[in-house]
Structures are given as C-alpha cells and as structure tokens.
UniProtKB/Swiss-Prot annotation:
Polar residues: compositionally biased ranges: 165-174, 269-291, 347-364, 381-398, 449-462, 501-511
Gene that encodes the chain: wetA
Gene Ontology biological process terms in this record: asexual spore wall assembly; conidium formation; regulation of transcription by RNA polymerase II; trehalose biosynthetic process
Ranges of compositional bias, category Basic residues: 463-473
Disruption outcome: Causes the formation of defective spore walls and a lack of trehalose biogenesis, leading to a rapid loss of spore viability and reduced tolerance to various stresses. Also leads to delayed germtube formation and reduced hyphal branching.
Gene induction: Highly expressed during conidiation. Expression is positively regulated by hsp90. Expression is also controlled by upstream regulators calA and crzA. Expression is decreased by 2',4'-Dihydroxychalcone (2',4'-DHC).
Comp. bias (Low complexity): 298-316, 435-448, 482-500
Protein name, per record: Developmental regulatory protein wetA
The family this protein is said to belong to: Belongs to the wetA family.
UniProt keyword Transcription, yes or no: yes
C-alpha cells in the first residue's frame, strides 16, 4: 500500500510553506502573476465582491459600486474565452511564498491580499458548469485547501468547525445570491470546458509538499494522521460539480437552474484524487503503523456538511473512499494484517475474557475452527483466536462485576450456542446454594447449644426459609419420635395405670382407633383440668381433717362426722 519510496527533494519546498510570517505577506502585496486571466476577470469587480480584500495591484482605494459577478462574466468578449482555453498556469517548484500564503485569505488578517490568477484558476477549474453563485462558494473552499490552513489547524475537530463555518449561508451575501443567477448554463459550460481540460493537471496542490519534517514534528499518533488525511481528502478530492445538488435545498435554493456535471469535471476530480493519493502515500511512510481497517472506512461525522455527499454520490465510488484504489486490488492483504496492531490496545478485554485458565484452550480452538471455516478469510500466524473476539462481546463480559462461576459461564458466549445452554444448566445449583446458605447457618449453630431435639426443631420453625424446605422432614421426625402416652385413668391419683406406649403412625378412622390406639395424649386443657381437680380434692381433704380435729377436741361423735363427710 505504501510501495513508493520517500523522496527528500520536497523538503526545501516544504520549508517555504512553513517558514513565512505576516510581515513577508504584507510586504509583498504588489506581487502578482501575469497571465491571460486579467482579461477574463476584472480586478476591481473581483475585489469588490469577494470581501474586504485589497486589490493585488497597488492602486488608490476608490469606492466602486458592488456589481454582481455574473454581469462581469457574461460581458466577456469571445477572445477572452479562447485565451482562457490556451492558459497554462504552471506551479513551479520555486514559487514565492506570498503567492501561496495569500490564498488562505479567510484564515489570515483582512488586509492580506490574494493574487487574482491563482484564485480564479482554482475557482474556474473546479466549477466549470456550476451557477455563478458557486464561485463564491468555491473561492472559500480554496482557502481551506492551502497548506497554511492545514498546517495551522491540525486538529480534526477544529478543521471541521471551520469547514462548516465557511459553508454557512451567513458568510454569503443574499444580494449577491440574488444578482448571481445563472441565465445561460450551457454557455458557461461550453466556455470553460477546454480551460478545465488544460489546467486540470497544473493546479495548485491540495496539500503541502510531502516532507519528513511534518512527520517528525507531528505529535499526534498514527491513527490521527490517517483520519486527518481521510477527512481532508473526503472534503477536497470530491467531484466539485456534485456540490450544487447537495446544497440546492438549503443554500442555493434561489438559483433557478442546476446544470448536470460534465465529463471534464469528473476527469478533473479523478486526476486530483490520484495526485493527492500519491502525495499522501509518500508522506505517511515514516509513520509507526499502517492505517487500520476502521480508520480507512471511517464513517462521516454528523457535523460535517458534506456527509450526505459521501454516502449518496455514485454508489460509494472513488470520490467517497480515498484509499479505494489500493484496497480493491489488495482486499485481504490490506485489511486483515492491520488487525494485530489493533489487538494489543485492548488488554483489559483480552484478560477478562480469557481469565479462566482451564477453559482458555477450548475457547481458542473453537474460535480458530469457527473463523477459519469460511466466516473470516485470512489470519496472521501470530494472531491469537482468543483475542479476535469482537470488543462488543468483550464489553458485555466486562460490563458488570460478576462472581467467578458466572464469569466462566459468560466467557463461552462468543464461541458456540451449545456452550451457553450447558453452562446455564450448570450454573443454576450455585445460585440456589447461595440463597440457601443463610438459612442453613442457624441450624449448625443451634445444635450444640440446645439440648433436646424437640426444642431445636421448634427454634428452626421460626425461620421463614426453613419452613418451606424442611416442613416434611420435621413432620416425619415428630411422628417417628417415641412419646409417653397416658392412660384414660391418669387423672385419679391412686390409679397407677400409667403406661408408655410407642405409636408409629396416626390413623383417624374410628375402627382403627379402637384396634390400635389405647390412649390419647394429654392436651393443654386436660392438664389444666386435672390440676384444678387435684387442688379441689386437696382442699376438701384439708377441710375435712380440720373439722374432725375440732369435733374430737370438743368431745363430740367423730365417727358420725366422718360418715357424713366421706
């Protein structure tokens, strides 16, 4: 992809782009390149319409009435168009710095000037068949093409903001839009068709000359350099004749006629694209790593005003993807070997997914079999299968802190769906074990301290968790334990008929109660009743004894009294 060797002959030309200041620009206002464009575009009308810029030829500042650009263009003589077709505006290797730096007049101070032939050659060559309102639009676009503007605004975010600001309708006067309506689009396309063919290979370069100085002094990483060139080529190497169709509803809705793009404009855009690709491939030779796949196929940002044109123009042709001519020839070789450079940048995802040691080999073998089976084509020999999992799957694994057994379960999700079913069935007992563990702990503590098993079971009945799990177990223990059963005559003190019977089970049918049961266990109410009856008998006995003693002391008949009391 970067097969061309780097040439150090551009360093002197690059130093001329870099080493210039505003004093040199201001001191060379009278520098102008003479050509045949002086006959096409008059200097006074251009200086009065393009903004607050002084004319390049030092004249006295006379106030002239602003005239629309279209009136100057349509009043051209026929020999001016013929001389424009024979124009040869070549870019020498030793161009004066002010002639190049003055092109960025929207980013410099207002008193700076711009040479008329350079600007008009850029505007007319890039828009041969567009409305006259578009040359304002294209002249502002050429300011962003200049090397100084790219050198000053290396941040991609600031460059997108400047590009968005330069295309806003507030910078264009509505009176000029009203006055600049195109009346004869066929005549415009016919006049400048020959000129665009002559000057297509001789325009100013879209970027500063490729130099290793820029790569050495660049502090941004390699991915930002690639995205820097992608955004610059996305906005600059596009077909310039397609611009009115993208902005016709918002900005240029006042122009009545939109002309179709001519074949010369498409040829011009392709030549510009190939020239820029050759320069950008040379300038990125000294970078540390090749551009990765997601940087090459970068999606357009929503803040970019040309995002619509990159996806809706000519079914994603060469103008939308700047690195397409290299990638179509070497698809697999350019896409997959760049992936291992992206893999070590995500060590946290890799270690979390592959953290369980016994399951690491299974996961890597399954992923090698899966991805070499036809889903993914080419891999490097040092490319590990466990690290090739997509970061979206890894972010699902690392999204929430989870225990070790759950982590073992989720680490097999990107491999096969059968692993997920087996491990989900495997992971259900530990979940139940963790829910049962708080209820099992009081039983282990209470067994040595509490003496009788009945009191232990009564204490565990109070726990809400144990009632559901151990209700059947407690009922079987209560029926199997031997209990003392009192006979029916247990209320009488002197009966002596207390027996201990072992009852194995209880059946509530009347016939079985006659055959099996010999007594009923005393309940709480029967115990209270027996105690009260015993107290009443003791009270009557004490009273009778006291009465007998009193009668005996008095000398009465004791036998007759005992017969009455007993």
């Amino acid at each position: 992809m970067f097969a061309q060797p780097f040439d150090h002959a551009f360093n002197d030309l690059f130093s001329q782009y870099v080493d210039m200041d505003s004093s040199m620009v201001d001191g060379n206002k009278d520098v102008s390149i003479p050509s045949d464009f002086d006959q096409i575009f008059s200097l006074d009308s251009l200086s009065s319409d393009c903004g607050d810029h002084s004319p390049p030829v030092p004249t006295k500042p006379t106030h002239q009435s602003p005239q629309p650009w279209a009136t100057d263009l349509w009043s051209l003589p026929q020999d001016a168009a013929s001389s424009a077709s024979q124009c040869s505006f070549t870019f020498q290797d030793t161009v004066h710095p002010s002639a190049v730096s003055d092109l960025s007049f929207h980013l410099e101070a207002p008193p700076t000037s711009h040479p008329v032939p350079a600007v008009t050659c850029k505007a007319s060559s890039r828009s041969p068949s567009t409305p006259p309102a578009t040359p304002h639009h294209k002249s502002t676009k050429s300011a962003l093409v200049t090397p100084k503007s790219i050198r000053r605004h290396r941040d991609s975010h600031e460059r997108k903001l400047l590009r968005k600001q330069s295309f806003s309708p507030s910078l264009m006067r509505p009176s000029q839009l009203q006055a600049g309506r195109m009346m004869y689009p066929e005549a415009w396309a016919q006049r400048f068709q020959n000129f665009s063919l002559h000057s297509s290979g001789e325009h100013l370069p879209l970027s500063p000359p490729p130099s290793d100085i820029l790569v050495q002094h660049e502090n941004t990483p390699a991915d930002n350099v690639v995205t820097h060139m992608n955004h610059s080529t996305e906005g600059l190497s596009r077909n310039p004749a397609e611009m009115p169709s993208h902005y016709e509803t918002g900005i240029f809705n006042q122009s009545p006629a939109i002309s179709m793009p001519s074949p010369s404009a498409k040829l011009l855009a392709q030549q510009q694209q190939h020239n820029y690709l050759s320069q950008s491939n040379n300038s990125t030779m000294a970078t540390s790593s090749p551009p990765s796949g997601d940087d090459i196929f970068s999606s357009p940002h929503s803040s970019d005003p040309q995002s619509l044109s990159s996806w809706h123009s000519d079914s994603l042709g060469g103008s939308a993807l700047p690195f397409t001519p290299e990638l179509q020839a070497h698809d697999g070789q350019a896409w997959w070997p760049s992936m291992p450079s992206r893999v070590p940048r995500q060590p946290s995802y890799q270690h979390v997914v592959s953290s369980p040691a016994p399951q690491r080999s299974i996961q890597s073998n399954n992923q090698h079999d899966l991805m070499q089976g036809g889903l993914m084509i080419q891999f490097d020999s040092s490319f590990d299968g466990s690290t090739s999992a997509d970061p979206s799957f890894s972010s699902v694994v690392t999204s929430a802190p989870m225990p070790q057994e759950n982590q073992n379960m989720y680490s097999h999700i990107p491999v096969t769906p059968q692993k997920y079913m087996n491990l989900s069935a495997y992971a259900t007992p530990p979940v139940q074990h963790t829910s049962r563990s708080p209820s099992l702990s009081p039983r282990g503590r209470g067994s040595p301290t509490q003496g009788s098993p009945l009191r232990n079971e009564a204490s565990t009945k109070t726990s809400p968790h144990r009632r559901g799990y151990h209700g059947r177990k407690l009922s079987s223990q209560s029926m199997n334990t031997p209990k003392p059963v009192k006979g029916p005559n247990s209320s009488s003190p002197g009966s002596g008929s207390n027996k201990s019977l072992t009852v194995s089970f209880v059946n509530f049918t009347p016939n079985d109660s006659k055959k099996i049961l010999t007594g009923v266990a005393p309940s709480g109410s029967s115990k209270t009743k027996a105690r009260r009856e015993q107290e009443a008998r003791d009270r009557r006995r004490k009273l009778s004894e006291a009465a007998i003693n009193a009668v005996r002391k008095a000398g009465g008949d004791v036998e007759a009294l005992e017969a009455v009391l007993c």
